[in-house]
């Protein structure tokens, strides 16, 4: 997909350009999915009333409060805006919050008894994370209005005057005012360290900051002063799961006080200092818990149930069921819009957003219940790319239950033709706040009708993303004969990422080119590409390129120096190439794909999403997927064999079936010297989203667009006088039914061999030789651990360069 924002990590020459995710607010995906507040189906961000009798929290897009000893939960806000991050004023009269309205994040306030919401900020830059001064006259908040990332500002509530408070390099977030009102705590980067920063303090009257505590964090710390001002409660990931920890305000060794295998977040000390509230994801969605200030195991927690509830507007219940054409229950992705314009998800569900279209969704196994504002409710059910979306509208009556059934009918039955859709690049845990289990993960894939989900365990910074023990080389026990989930590995190097699927053991280390670690040097992909093959698996290229040539008439080889793919392919390595991926641009990736094919390399076209299924602001697995034509019953081995043979196409949504003289993608068509120069191309396209055009590609030359909106089947001829390859692709506009940026599908070619000779484009070979030179120019000053390591890497560069020089018939000018 085309990235709207790019986050450049220019830490050294060994660090590649990392593209950011689809952006609603104009920031990287990491910021938008981890720093920014999220819509949750359970309680989040608890905040005590000053007298300790109430706890405010956010849930389902509103601010609620509940007696701290338990009882009825009362909503203080209602749509159409979403409300998050409540902060109870020290005088007890008001609750400030972050609000999402008009496509932006702002700070607002409401009476602690509910009522009219007052929007306090309306700058075009995002404002969030409000924290009160001790006299309840000012709000400290985080904003991008400084133009250099996130800084901390102070807003005087009476006249809305805003003044800067902390404007250091990097992002300053999560402000908290000391009990005596004299010191501000916040989170800010620590030079030379990974993560989003440590806990700092700064006198509000002026003075230098003091680093209290550092650990590799991901916008999760949210420090809160204890009432005596002597310590901070904060969220720690040092033990491999998010836990509440306590550290002295003057610095020192922290203690973890909620050591549970799942995650605990957003600790808030009670006003008397005897206990603290927090949220836990041990059951999946957030639950509200209270524990003694000294912490303790699960048995010492007091669960605060959120029910009964008193909403701010009349509500009703919707009971919905999704079925197939025969009436059998069917898992699906669900999108709803209520009468207030907001999206809702069932209690206990996982509310998520496809950021590229700002579409809210959740997954359902079949039946689900929704408590929503009275009035018309629009519901849509989707299931992958082979079923037509089903939509309906129901009129929700106050206090009543409405029953609705959505029927999903097939657009095409690809498995009946031997084609099975899978994802080469899904993920598991990635620091999201939802308590993702194997069951939840599998149910996501089932609802998306993914027949093979390759879940890649990887490393982000120095932290493992996933569960070490999941990589067994066997399908997960939840798998069925038609829908398989199997864990695999991703190597995240500074010059591209390698996916290893169908493997039994890890190829280590999991990372390379990571500054401030023992693996800061550039790493070769070859051990990973070879390591997967040695185990009987496949290794391929994830999210290859983020953009097409800036000047197609005179492409610059240096633009393509961020990936080792041209080196690896020249060395005979690599089993597949994800033309479609959320974290790359399909047209840009296709441009390099065609150049590699034009040098005689046979590389299957595939698709892999690179989604994070426990993160709320991310698309589902199978957003980008690979269709492989399997011989015999579906299994991991048969699907991988089909990919290896190139019987594939990659897609963001459209299904495209190609034959050339009756041959299918990955096949070879041998023609004699006297055979006709023209071959017959047949293409059939089916798509749940609009598509504009079909294009036939011959030896890298994209043919004239063929309109297919009303004629999904095409038959014609193309000329291949010198042999080479013939492939097809389909392109369409953005669509709410496409979770990537636009509709796109690319087949693997049918390879045409005329008179026994392989077609090679000398121009493309020369260009790729230049790309290899550019890669070495980028990496030659990497912090190599030894001269031998540098020499070994350079030898691979030289070997790849020699391949392209040979294919070009010599250097440029030959």
Description of each model-found segment:
Residues 417-605, 609, 615-616:
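Catalytic cores of extracellular degradative/oxidative enzymes
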Residues 116, 141, 154, 161, ...:
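Long luminal/extracellular ectodomains of secretory-pathway precursor proteins
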Residues 146-147, 191-194, 413-416, 492-493, ...:
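Short glycine/serine/proline-enriched coil/turn segments at secondary-structure junctions
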Residues 325-342, 348-352, 356-370, 376, ...:
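C-terminal functional module detector
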Residues 1-7:
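Bacterial N-terminal signal peptides that target proteins for export
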Residues 53, 74, 118, 255, ...:
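Solvent-exposed, polar/charged alpha-helical surfaces in well-ordered, non-transmembrane soluble domains
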Residues 20-317:
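Sequence signature of WD/YWTD-type beta-propeller architectures
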Residues 7-16:
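Bacterial N-terminal signal peptides
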């Amino acid at each position: 997909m085309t990235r709207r924002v790019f986050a450049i990590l220019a830490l050294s020459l060994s660090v590649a350009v990392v593209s950011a995710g689809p952006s609603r607010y104009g920031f990287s995906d990491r910021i938008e999915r981890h720093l920014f507040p999220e819509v949750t189906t359970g309680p989040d961000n608890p905040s005590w009333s000053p007298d300790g009798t109430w706890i405010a929290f956010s849930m389902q897009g509103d601010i609620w409060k509940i007696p701290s000893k338990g009882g009825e939960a009362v909503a203080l806000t209602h749509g159409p805006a979403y409300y998050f991050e409540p902060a109870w004023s020290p005088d007890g009269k008001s609750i400030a919050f972050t609000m999402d309205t008009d496509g932006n994040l702002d700070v607002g306030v409401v009476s602690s008894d509910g009522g009219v919401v007052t929007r306090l900020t309306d700058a075009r830059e995002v404002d969030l994370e409000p924290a009160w001064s001790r006299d309840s006259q000012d709000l400290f908040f985080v904003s991008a209005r400084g133009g250099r990332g996130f800084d901390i500002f102070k807003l005087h509530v009476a006249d809305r005057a805003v003044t800067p408070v902390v404007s250091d390099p990097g992002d300053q977030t999560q402000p908290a005012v000391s009990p005596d009102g004299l010191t501000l705590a916040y989170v800010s980067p620590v030079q030379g360290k990974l993560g989003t920063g440590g806990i700092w303090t700064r006198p509000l009257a002026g003075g230098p900051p003091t680093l209290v505590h550092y650990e590799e964090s991901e916008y999760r710390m949210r420090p809160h002063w204890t009432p005596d001002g002597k310590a901070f409660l904060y969220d720690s990931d040092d033990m491999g799961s998010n836990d509440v920890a306590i550290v002295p305000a003057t610095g020192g060794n922290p203690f973890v006080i909620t050591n549970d295998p799942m995650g605990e977040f957003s600790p808030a000390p009670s006003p008397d200092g005897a206990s603290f509230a927090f949220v836990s994801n041990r059951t999946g969605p957030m639950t509200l818990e209270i524990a003694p200030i000294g912490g303790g195991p699960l048995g010492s927690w007091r669960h605060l149930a959120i029910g009964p509830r008193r909403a701010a507007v009349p509500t009703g219940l919707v009971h919905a069921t999704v079925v197939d054409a025969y009436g059998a229950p069917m898992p699906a992705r669900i999108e709803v819009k209520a009468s207030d314009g907001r999206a809702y998800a069932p209690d206990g569900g996982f509310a998520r957003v496809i950021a590229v279209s700002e579409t809210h969704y959740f997954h359902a196994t079949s039946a689900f219940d929704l408590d929503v504002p009275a009035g018309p409710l629009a519901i849509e059910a989707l299931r992958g790319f082979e079923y037509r979306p089903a939509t309906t509208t129901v009129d929700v009556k106050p206090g009543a239950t409405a029953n609705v059934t959505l029927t999903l009918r097939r657009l095409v039955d690809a498995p009946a033709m031997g084609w099975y859709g899978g994802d080469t690049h899904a993920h598991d845990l990635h620091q999201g706040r939802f308590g993702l289990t194997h069951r939840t993960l599998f149910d996501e894939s089932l609802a998306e009708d993914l027949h093979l989900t390759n879940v890649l365990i990887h490393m982000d910074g120095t932290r493992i993303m996933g569960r070490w023990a999941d990589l067994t080389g066997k399908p997960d026990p939840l798998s069925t004969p038609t829908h398989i989930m199997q864990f695999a590995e991703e190597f995240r190097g500074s010059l591209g990422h390698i996916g290893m699927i169908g493997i039994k053991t890890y190829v280590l280390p999991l990372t390379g080119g990571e500054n401030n670690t023992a693996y800061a040097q550039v790493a070769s992909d070859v051990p990973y590409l070879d390591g997967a093959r040695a185990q009987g698996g496949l290794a391929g290229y994830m999210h290859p390129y983020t953009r097409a040539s800036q000047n197609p008439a005179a492409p610059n080889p240096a633009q393509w120096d961020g990936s080792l793919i041209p080196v690896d392919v020249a060395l005979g390595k690599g089993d597949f190439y994800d033309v479609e991926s959320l974290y790359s641009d399909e047209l840009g990736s296709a441009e390099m794909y065609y150049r590699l094919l034009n040098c005689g390399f046979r590389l299957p076209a595939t698709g892999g999403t690179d989604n994070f299924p426990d993160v709320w602001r991310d698309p589902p697995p199978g957003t980008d997927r690979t269709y492989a034509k399997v011989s015999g019953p579906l299994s991991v081995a048969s699907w991988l064999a089909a990919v290896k043979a190139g019987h594939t196409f990659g897609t963001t949504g459209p299904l495209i079936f190609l034959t050339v003289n009756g041959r299918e993608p990955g096949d070879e068509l041998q023609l004699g010297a006297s055979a006709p120069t023209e071959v017959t191309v047949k293409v059939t396209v089916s798509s749940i989203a609009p598509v504009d055009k079909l294009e036939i590609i011959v030896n890298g030359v994209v043919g004239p667009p063929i309109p297919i909106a009303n004629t999904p089947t095409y038959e014609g001829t193309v000329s291949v006088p010198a042999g080479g390859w013939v492939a097809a692709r389909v392109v369409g506009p953005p669509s709410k039914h496409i979770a990537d940026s636009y509709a796109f599908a690319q087949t693997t070619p049918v390879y045409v061999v005329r008179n026994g000779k392989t077609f090679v484009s000398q121009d493309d070979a020369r260009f790729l030789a230049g790309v290899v030179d550019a890669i070495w120019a980028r990496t030659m000053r990497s912090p190599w651990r030894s001269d031998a390591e540098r020499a070994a890497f350079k030898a691979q560069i030289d070997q790849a360069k020699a391949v392209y020089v040979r294919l070009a018939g010599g250097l440029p000018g030959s």
